[in-house]
């Protein structure tokens, strides 16, 4: 398993505005809020890792935002990939729908980093994920990253049972 799981929250709201997403009213404002104190977050993560040296643990991002989509503005992933390269037992998972792969070309692949893509049937995505890259574009990007040595994860999100007739 993934061991203890920690959500890393560096930003609120998402540019993709997917119609089913809980972020559609989660916060008082639809404005983006970016926390820029990455060093403080890294210090806290480091404390957790050192305190629980023998435990498996996963730190993920992409719950309250799409970290990869906003990377050109936040520089978050560029900052955290080198950080996690020092902690091989800690898994860093980046949850995304973005096809922005620029940051991954700047770094060597990490065995403890997973780029996890949310997927659903293309026809459903055209209805629900109108502002997000197409599923086929995401799959193409996953292949590109996998060929470069990055680990890929799949997240089937949302799981909807016949709520929409396609």
Predicted features and spans:
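Core AdoMet radical
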Residues: 25-141, 151-155
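Short, small-residue-biased leader/transition segments that mark boundaries at the very start
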Residues: 2-6
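Catalytic metal-binding/acid-base residues of hydrolase active sites
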Residues: 159
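Catalytic cores of alpha/beta
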Residues: 163
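Canonical Radical SAM [4Fe-4S] cluster-binding loop centered on the CxxxCxxC motif
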Residues: 7-36
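Hydrophobic/aromatic ligand-binding patch that stacks against planar heteroaromatic rings
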Residues: 144
């Amino acid at each position: 398993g993934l061991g203890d799981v920690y959500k890393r929250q560096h930003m609120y709201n998402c540019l993709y505005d997917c119609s089913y997403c809980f972020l559609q009213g989660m916060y008082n404002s639809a404005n983006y809020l970016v926390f820029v104190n990455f060093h403080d977050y890294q210090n806290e993560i480091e404390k957790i890792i050192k305190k629980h040296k023998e435990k498996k643990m996963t730190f993920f991002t992409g719950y309250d935002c799409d970290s990869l989509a906003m990377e050109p503005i936040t520089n978050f992933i560029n900052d955290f990939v080198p950080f996690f390269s020092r902690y091989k037992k800690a898994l860093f998972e980046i949850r995304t729908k973005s096809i922005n792969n620029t940051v991954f070309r700047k770094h060597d692949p990490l065995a403890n980093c997973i780029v996890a893509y949310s997927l659903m049937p293309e026809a459903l995505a055209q209805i629900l994920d109108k502002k997000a890259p197409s599923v086929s574009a995401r799959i193409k990007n996953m292949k590109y990253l996998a060929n470069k040595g990055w680990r890929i994860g799949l997240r089937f999100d949302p799981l909807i049972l016949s709520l929409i007739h396609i």
